[in-house]
């Protein structure tokens, strides 16, 4: 019983003029998702997928590399203008935004969508080094 060879369908090239860049920057990693205006994903990348491991994932340079990777994939689909939604307290927020602008995207607006707890869960205790 030989298995039939299945072909994986290549992602077809979409022609989308504008999109939304969701930059999620935590203390440990930075993830960038570029979607169309409806929220359907076009491209994504993170510091971990760029080959950074451990504490190097949380650096601004790793966030910059991830943003450039996601941005280039989105440009292949025809994205030219971006709205940027930044979320989280991490160090990669600013550098990811600068990297997207440096690639050649026209950034129309920047929103901070970090959720703020109204006395929710107790935060982790401070580190004593």
Curated annotation (Swiss-Prot):
Keywords: Ribonucleoprotein, Ribosomal protein, RNA-binding, rRNA-binding. Transmembrane segments: none annotated. GO terms for cellular component: ribonucleoprotein complex; ribosome. One of its GO terms (biological process) is translation. InterPro entries: Ribosomal_uS11, Ribosomal_uS11_bac-type, Ribosomal_uS11_CS, Ribosomal_uS11_sf. GO terms for molecular function: rRNA binding; structural constituent of ribosome. Located on the platform of the 30S subunit, it bridges several disparate RNA helices of the 16S rRNA. Forms part of the Shine-Dalgarno cleft in the 70S ribosome. Part of the 30S ribosomal subunit. Interacts with proteins S7 and S18. Binds to IF-3. Belongs to the universal ribosomal protein uS11 family. HAMAP family: Ribosomal_uS11. This is Small ribosomal subunit protein uS11. The lineage of its organism: Bacteria, Pseudomonadati, Pseudomonadota, Alphaproteobacteria, Rhodobacterales.
